[in-house]
Amino acid sequence: MDLPYRPVALGLLALAFSALVWQRAQAGGSHYFPPVSDPVVVEECGSCHLAFPPSMLPASSWKRMMSELKNHFGDDARVDAATATHISDYLMSNAGDTGGRRYSDKLLRGTSTSKAPLRITELERWVGEHREVPAWEWRHKDVRSKANCLACHSGAERGYYDDD
Amino acid sequence: MKSQAGLLLLIAVPAMASASALAAPREDLLAGYAAQAKQDDPGFAGFSAARGEAFHRRSFGRGKVDTPACTSCHADDPRAAGKTPAGKIIDPVALSASPSRYADPAKVRKWFGRNCKEVLGRACTAQEKGDWLSFMLSQ
């Protein structure tokens, strides 16, 4: 049997490429991180700052975060044991190297999970993406904190962190 | 007639009971603070919304640097929304503006616990909590 190898190969290539694009489009590009959907996690992790998407950090980071709530970036953010277990389970199963892997591949590139980084804003990729933001903009009264994603990313609460 | 009156009672009593159950958590909170305040100071003479208002606006500067006062995060006007250092909007603290507030005692305990430490650098006394809450309930 004579197979038309070249057209078939080209066809497959085109198919693979569009599948890749389609997957990206569905995920909203590399700047989409699904927002927290669990009401307990939204309440407990989203009162002082935006409830950061679990896919922005590896599971090791969330584990460490939850074990250090007494000094949570200077605040005592302890919760009762049952709530803590609930939050830990959610964060760790949706983390950037577990359930949320498909959203985090770029953000966590170059991040060592064994180091369990606590600050999203110290991830190599995050720093690179925000290099062009001038110091005065960080100090602006409507920004003030690098944890204030929403100040510049108006879609942050819906999971979109595109360039604005 | 008699059965009608009975029917009315059947409707009215549960309605009254549920109304008081809805109002009770805030009163229970205040009663609890009052009992503690009396224990702390036998001369305790009740709570004052005016004292609570002064407390709300006072700059303590004994806790965290960026939160010297309640109004560092909550608005100066309790009926307006506040904002945390990380930019999160906080619903108004006045009951009239946020009618669901202060109904869950565990939540009230949690936030007094955290916020007093961050603003005053210590736990609030029962007198302080009762005064502040009285102010917010009156607003």
Where are these regions (language model features)?
Chain B
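C-terminal capping alpha-helices of c-type cytochrome domains
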Residues: 109-139
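Bacterial N-terminal signal peptides that target proteins for export
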Residues: 1-8
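The canonical Cys-X-X-Cys-His
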Residues: 67-77, 132
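Solvent-exposed, acidic/flexible segments
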Residues: 41-49, 63-67, 101, 105, ...
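Short microdomains enriched in Cys/His and/or Lys/Arg
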Residues: 91-106
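Electrostatic cytochrome c docking/interface patches
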Residues: 25-63
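N-terminal signal peptide c-region/cleavage motif recognized by signal peptidases
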Residues: 12, 18-20
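Short cysteine/histidine-rich zinc-coordinating motifs and their immediately flanking basic loops
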Residues: 82-89
